């Protein structure tokens, strides 16, 4: 008999926790896993005493669902998603809903949306952020796809999502086709940027100011009471304080080689593809790549010389505040770039994205959750057509207030030989964005010189001109510009 409100396939920890979260909010969930024994284990242990039901086959699972049937896939992105869809389609009716809650590539989601729409099935690709704890007690959810599905899943999704402010859910409809997974991808890219910025602040504290672990932990705790109030700053303080079983701090013992699952890389690739200068996320990805060359770096450290022993002789408290402001200003740049990419994607794909709503979705339940995101929502509330966060009065003033400190932190770090790829690229972007004139005129002249690619004159935009730079070349009369 149909009794379940929704089914979930994939009983890894995230799947189990999402099921328990839905159960807590009064929804009856049917659990299924490819390895069927996992269903029995889950019902006998974690789900014991709940209303969760299990199924031993996909056919049984579908038979237990109320119509329209709602099925969440929480399996490994890629082929596994397509395999389950292929098995589910013959068992479903027109108007039934399949939701992919994994870290799928947004183009795959768009393809699945179109394929399933032709078969009468409503497909949703939803970003899910917040990790295992978020899944259990309130994630950030970013659903997109076939909007006809939204009225049938809205109550469940907004019910289980994290809440902020006066109980606003960190979940709303994002947009058509792959929009939900694109927004999740950008979220993950921003997460890479936030983490790298914090690492660079930590590096300056440790190697320029010579601060001890507990001293740095206290600084991050203090910063968490300022504009930087966020989950990542909070856990950084906890990590710095944490002691191993031998009573010594754990962090200095951890191998400095950062892993990555690839979602930050996807964001950087998309930025290149759509011609958006998302420089900070790109540098954050490359910083992880460089960190992974541990053995090479050990060899290089013995052969490549940097500045002579740097001795900081300034005011320590004042420079610590410079680092904090540099971190805040760089964070603003990172989010400005992330929203530039969202805006360009919306143009490319014809999506109508609610940028303030996206900021609210990230305000709680996810890894980048912070008070700062509320300010972004406010900016888009003031001007839904805002071209760039830096042009909003609040963020313009915030960056101006940080600018002197930002430049001091970066220049001091450079003099000390500290790698700060994200601090420096953020500052370079800011300086580039605020310059009416950039030296790209020389690039255009060079391109025309060696390849007759033509250029425009400031006084005659839209007219493409070729110059015979050497006296040996020809002329270009065509106004087509394709290089």
From Swiss-Prot:
Superkingdom per UniProt: Eukaryota
UniProt feature coiled coil, ranges: none
Positions of modified residues (N6-acetyllysine): 38, 59, 309
PROSITE patterns, per the entry: 6PGD (PS00461)
Pathway the protein contributes to: Carbohydrate degradation; pentose phosphate pathway; D-ribulose 5-phosphate from D-glucose 6-phosphate (oxidative stage): step 3/3
Chain positions recorded as NADP(+) binding sites: 10-15, 33-35, 75-77, 103, 478-481
InterPro entries: 6-PGluconate_DH-like_C_sf, 6PGD_dom2, 6PGDH_C, 6PGDH_Gnd/GntZ, 6PGDH_NADP-bd, 6PGdom_BS, NAD(P)-bd_dom_sf, Pgluconate_DH
GO MF annotation terms: carbohydrate binding; carboxylic acid binding; NADP binding; phosphogluconate dehydrogenase (decarboxylating) activity
Stored SMART domains: 6PGD
Active site: 184 (proton acceptor), 191 (proton donor)
Reaction(s) the record says it catalyses: 6-phospho-D-gluconate + NADP(+) = D-ribulose 5-phosphate + CO2 + NADPH
Top-tier EC class: oxidoreductase
Keywords, in A-Z order: Acetylation, Cytoplasm, Gluconate utilization, NADP, Oxidoreductase, Pentose shunt, Phosphoprotein
Modified residue annotations for Phosphoserine: 57, 129
Gene Ontology BP terms: D-gluconate metabolic process; pentose biosynthetic process; pentose-phosphate shunt; pentose-phosphate shunt, oxidative branch
EC nos: 1.1.1.44
Binding site for substrate: 103, 129-131, 187-188, 192, 261, 288, 447, 453
Task of the protein: Catalyzes the oxidative decarboxylation of 6-phosphogluconate to ribulose 5-phosphate and CO(2), with concomitant reduction of NADP to NADPH.
Assembly notes: Homodimer.
Name listed for the protein in its UniProt record: 6-phosphogluconate dehydrogenase, decarboxylating
Source species: Homo sapiens
Gene encoding the protein: PGD
